Amino acid sequence: MSMEGVFLEKTKTNTTTTLPDLSLHISLPDIHQYHHNESSKESSRRSSQLENNNRSSNFELSLSHHNHPTARIFHCPDRRTLNLPHQQHYNNPIINGVHQRVDESEISNLHRPIRGIPVYHNRSFPFHQQNSSLPSLGGGDMDQISILNSSSGYNNAYRSLQSSPRLKGVPLHHHHHHNQYGVVGSSDSSSPHHHNHHHHGMIRSRFLPKMPTKRSMRAPRMRWTSSLHARFVHAVELLGGHERATPKSVLELMDVKDLTLAHVKSHLQMYRTVKTTNKPAASSDGSGEEEMGINGNEVHHQSSTDQRAQSDDTSLHQETDISSTQPRWSNSSRETWPLSNNCSSDIDTMIRTSSTSMISHYQRSSIQNQEQRSNDQAKRCGNLSCENPSLEFTLGRPDWHEK
């Protein structure tokens, strides 16, 4: 029979005078004392169970040496011991009376500071904000602990966590995820410098325009109209003619928008070619009027290249024909140039015709040189036969074959 709650009372008697009272007085135990004994037993049983479970789930978070005597051990309870409060009430209804007292003791044990890592009780744990399904670090007992606040403390904690093989219920890839994007610290306005630098770097690389590409140095194609050519001729005449004019000075005198030095240089070169090939007759008044045109220039250039192979009569005949068919133009700015506006295409055709004429001239000259060489060789031989000499020779007397 259990003797709990049974109190034996002995009456004070004088042993010398009377006999001792050996009667038993049985009464009901005190209710408050009974609940106190039950709660103490349950708390001791629960604390022993926690100690047995914590032996397999302890890992060191100290940043000091392993042999240092002041290193502290952070006890991470097992997943089974960190059930939600309502699950504990359903599974063990006897502990309902002492649950609040046990939670306070657990919180006091879990809130012990870790050496090397600051502990702040007014901020929530960062893993609990990001993922509430992490039981060992994001539970209700740990939501008031903030292990890290700066990037340096965060990196040190990450190195110490990497030393252990595996956290109970916390995979390390979540930790690496937070470190990669710089989402560290609490939810207040203070954010790490690394996160700000990374964020601004992404914005700078995304929204800034690229470096401007190098502009092509080739000038755009220019169409020389009649009025533009008249202005060009007027500038050349003011500078003393095509022989003394320079492209830069002509460009300054023309003062035309979007006209480059390359345009003036090419046009002046073509103008000099036309002026040198076509020998104009100087007028008495010095106005310098010539009879020329685009097609006339082509024929003049072709006739000048073919003068060596043709006679003077044919060249004069071509000039008279061209002068009678083509209109005349003046180099003064008051008159217009009644020719085709597509000067560039005419220049290309003129270059092609001049090149073909030069090739034909060289072919004719080579044929003439060959004929001249053959004639010289015939003159050297004269009337003598140029056959191969006989290489036969005899020894002794020439008539020994006959004998």
Curated annotation (Swiss-Prot):
It is found in: Nucleus. Residues 35-54, 273-345, 357-403 are annotated as: Disordered. Induction: Repressed by AS2 in adaxial tissue. InterPro entries: Homeodomain-like_sf, KAN_fam, Myb_dom_plants, SANT/Myb. Its main location: nucleus. Coiled coil: none annotated. Disruption phenotype: Flat leaves. Altered morphology of abaxial mesophyll cells. Decreased number of trichomes on the adaxial surface and increased number of abaxial trichomes. GO terms for molecular function: DNA-binding transcription factor activity; transcription cis-regulatory region binding. NCBIfam families: myb_SHAQKYF. This is Transcription repressor KAN1. It comes from Arabidopsis thaliana.
